[in-house]
Amino acid sequence: RAAGHTVTGCDQNVYPPMSTQLEALGIELIEGFEAGQLERVQPDIFVVGNVVKRGMPLMEAILDRGLPYTSGPQWLAENVLAGRWVLAVAGTHGKTTTSSMLAWILEANGLAPGFLIGGIPENFAVSARLPGEPAQEPGGESPFFVIEADEYDTAFFDKRSKFVHYHPRTAILNNLEFDHADIFADLPAIETQFHHLVRTVPGTGRLVVNGREASLARVLERGCWTPVETFAAPAGSGWQAGEADDDGHFDVLLDGDTVGRVRWNLMGEHNRLNAVAAVAAARHAGVRPQDACAALAMFANVKRRMEVKGSVNGVTVYDDFAHHPTAIATTVAGLRARVGTARILAVLEPRSNTMKLGTMKAELPASLAQADRVFGYQGGLGWDLAAALAPLGDKAQSFGDLDALVAAVVAEAQPGDQVLVMSNGGFGGVHGKLLAALA
């Protein structure tokens, strides 16, 4: 739309913050995938998301009529990313946060990047924009574009990972473990897709790679033609995040030398490592590490990443996108580090495709171990959540009814408690229901 096009979209089960962002931008959203939409709109092209499948009436009508269509990643590559310096952030976890940090670092240093991020960074209030006018080049246009690089498949007609379309000059490989069990058979299958991404980065580009990850080491062993900078390597070389002080501030080190200090209040080692990766990638784009660290002092996290939704009668309710056991464990640990001995009431909806398959249900108890109480939502699962949470004993409960879950949380909550809601969906508006019931 910023490029001058009229944009109309269709989807189902759209929820905030994306639904409210579309409304604020004046972009019409049609609910569902019925063929009758073609009588209302006659687009020049249909950009097909990977949620669309054969058999959906709208897609069948598009094919029957021979109407032009493409995938989202392909459209981006041809119409937005072509000719630009693309900085891509890939990995199982932390893509949205790290992309937001990187975009903000470039913005704060006058580089006016474009970006496409799978969340809404608070510093920008939108999830995407075209490049702007750099401070150093009045009247010009920034060459930089930051993109969250997802390994999920592109579309029903293109089963490659989305990120192979993006052709980055700078790429962060943040971490890599098994996920997306609905489309990948095992971890080696995902490693192959990351290898394909590495193949697209030019020899004059840069790879910023988590040095702790054996899976990423295997990816690079299959072939790498680009200079590599590591972060978090066990030997202490490359980029490192120092220990955080009581305020959450920490030093950024490169080959043992302190090159900057980040002064913020974000919690958790995972965010320190996200920051170091962003600082390293920004340096490749010309930003000095000390300037990147200074920018992060003004970084506001992404919506749905430990976002405080409200506090009522001494009970604080958080919203977080965590849905993979590793992300759940990291989120709970981060909150524990912040709140000390305060009780954490974890409220979980395992609704990702991987979790719906039950592939990682055995890992849930360990991921929730640091919570004082656990309230799980059974809705939509084909496996027994209560049985999966049984190793947690009496501190865990499972509910098939959302109102019953809310009532149980409210009955348990005491002043000083921290209610941590984790889901990658709308969760039936549970945050608002909790806050209303707590009042």
Positions of the model-derived regions?
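ATP-dependent carboxylate-amine ligase
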Residues: 1-18, 22-30, 42-46, 67, ...
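Conserved RecA-like helicase motor-core motifs
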Residues: 10, 110-117, 231, 397
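Short, polar loop motifs at secondary-structure junctions
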Residues: 12-15, 33-35, 50-53, 74, ...
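Phosphate-binding loop of NTP-binding sites
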Residues: 23, 37-38, 50-211, 215-226, ...
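Short loop/edge segments at beta-strand edges and connector loops
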Residues: 31-33, 71-73, 117-119, 209-211, ...
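Short, ordered beta-strand-loop transition motifs
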Residues: 134, 138, 242-248, 311-312
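Acidic-glycine-rich active-site phosphate/pyrophosphate-binding loop
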Residues: 145, 241-260
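Histidine-centered acyl-transfer/condensation active-site motif
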Residues: 263-264
